[in-house]
């Protein structure tokens, strides 16, 4: 067999160690230093299964069973299971409580994985309206309109799905309003918290939520792939139905899900999560400061204003203008940031970009702001 494996040796990554990373998809998944030591204990394949009696969520050593109970309290739900990510959590709900051909009513900012999950479950969808440019906010009342439309057309509705915070604009949807609509109409309500649970406080019961899909690697300071599905006890029998052949195994979990480093890193980071969501107001303040400081340069923040989440999307005509005369063209901004020890902005992008300063210190935030100011002022 002629295979050269040298390229797989000594693989390194210096973005997090040597640079300030502004990538929104990564800011919430950074593991705290004190939690990293657990990796050395559990990096072997089935290391969490030393004392397993048949199911991941029932393991007592390490205390996965207690952790999941505590996580339910943290999210304001009844029962929690580990998954491989928010997309798998959504699919587990759709595949268990909906019938083939049912409709999922979901928001216009829904993540692509919501569509992939419902397609895989052989479901249909009805998309609700969102505000036009530049806010793109979810319109809660549109849910009632779409539900009425489907009911009048004799279409079966299986699920109401809302993206709590979308990844495109970082808008925080009005969950309580949509939850009240779902409850009044009598439909189960799934909240996609991939960009919220673990970053900001969540209380599923207060929000009238039946299911929460969370992402460990995106927003809960965990190694990937790792997610959580939290449910109300009302849906326990449907979502957590067990196999007729292997009676201890839950069907939607395919027996066991995220095992090894992903689930253990999430457990080790739990104390960190509990403390950091208490400081959410400070994260919002930092984000608003970035917007207020950079907009006078010629950046235009799109999405709801003022910011209520750490994701920032800027239109940047000033960068596009500089790119026209700079010999590096669209790569100049990436390269100038890299010189200053800043990464996470896509290479070659000048018309618009997304960023986040979640978890950065005030000193780091000021450095990012001043670095972008210096780039614009030097090259404009």
From Swiss-Prot:
Positions of pyridoxal 5'-phosphate binding: 86-87, 192, 215-217
Enzyme class: transferase
Alphabetized Pfam families for the sequence: SepSecS
Keywords, in A-Z order: Protein biosynthesis, Pyridoxal phosphate, Transferase
Catalysed reactions, semicolon-separated: O-phospho-L-seryl-tRNA(Cys) + hydrogen sulfide + H(+) = L-cysteinyl-tRNA(Cys) + phosphate
N6-(pyridoxal phosphate)lysine PTM sites in chain numbering: 218
InterPro entries (UniProt xref): PyrdxlP-dep_Trfase, PyrdxlP-dep_Trfase_major, PyrdxlP-dep_Trfase_small, Sep_Cys-tRNA_synth_arc, SepSecS/SepCysS
Keyword GTP-binding: no
The keyword Protein biosynthesis is assigned to this record: yes
Gene Ontology BP annotations: translation
One Gene Ontology term of the molecular function aspect: Sep-tRNA:Cys-tRNA synthase activity
Origin: domain of life: Archaea
EC numbers, comma separated: 2.5.1.73
Gene3D superfamilies referenced in this protein's UniProt entry, alphabetically: Aspartate Aminotransferase, domain 1, Type I PLP-dependent aspartate aminotransferase-like (Major domain)
Cofactor section: pyridoxal 5'-phosphate
Family: Belongs to the SepCysS family.
Function: Converts O-phospho-L-seryl-tRNA(Cys) (Sep-tRNA(Cys)) to L-cysteinyl-tRNA(Cys) (Cys-tRNA(Cys)).
Oligomer and partners: Homodimer. Interacts with SepRS.
Entry-linked HAMAP family: Sep_Cys_tRNA_synth
NCBIfam families: PRK09331.1, SepCysS
Protein name in UniProt: O-phospho-L-seryl-tRNA:Cys-tRNA synthase
Organism of origin: Methanococcus maripaludis (strain C7 / ATCC BAA-1331)
